[in-house]
Amino acid sequence: KSYLEEFELPYLRIPGFQKIKNNDIVVFNWPVDTMLNMYYTDKYHYKPIDKKTNYVKRSVGIAGDTLEIKEGYVYINGKKNELSDRAELQFSYLVQPKNRTFSKKVMVNNYDITDPFGIINRENTYQFIAMSDKTVDRFKNHPNVGSVEKYLSIEGERDSNIFPHNENYNWNNDFFGPIYIPKAGTTIDLNIENLPLYKRVIEVYENNTLKVNENNIFINGELAQDYTFKQDYYWLMGDNRHNSQDSRAWGFVPFDHVVGKPVFKWMSWNTNGKGFNKIRWDRMFTTVHGEGTPTSYFVPFLVFLGIYFGIKKWKKYKKED
């Protein structure tokens, strides 16, 4: 363990230059600490904030929003969330082949399908874990494809791995909410029905003692029928909607867990490539946010390095001369 529990400095952060907006990509400290805690969010909390694992997700919902998921798509305050053209949502699909198997090599090289896929039943139906709309449109023309159907959970069918992990909330990956995302200074009515949604916020993130006696809620020893939030919270999700550990599993991300916005992507690794093709050269040194196709600044970077070391060598030569 790289830290002491006996002595801990108070939380402090440098003021940021920008506020987090809807759909910004955010780096944050994973709020639930461990895989175990992801499914039992009201039982375990161990590490100091700065010692928690860094994650990167999209802030689909920000403080004060009401979020809902319908058929895998996010709705904010009743309106479908619109992403920039750089974002590519991916979903799982069921694919029925005509007569033969699918080659992993062909899937990777011809369709850029890098996530797992395989047969799931006796009818030889394949489940592809993640494909974008563009990939699906191309893949439908594959000579061995009979049918392609998006794989969605059933509305009203409860997934125990989904927040708030409570039998009274029949939510799953594709049908979730509505849920209010806490905003600093906002007061909500608090009762036994909505307590599972905000219990960890009140008890862990905002350092209160919370007890329930029959149907009565006590915060710091006093009967509570409402609660005022102390900080902002965010709802962070991955664009790979069926293969992402995100707020659907652990709930809200507090403001004090936010590290910032990523600006630059300096390396992109292709696990299916070989040799130099393991590096995605077109994605190196590209900006994270923005519209349109990302521009790589890798070549200008190499030119800059060449000039820098050239000048350095020339100065050394002149000094020796």
Residue ranges and their predicted role:
Residues 1-321:
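Extended hydrophobic leader/signal-anchor segments used for secretion and membrane insertion
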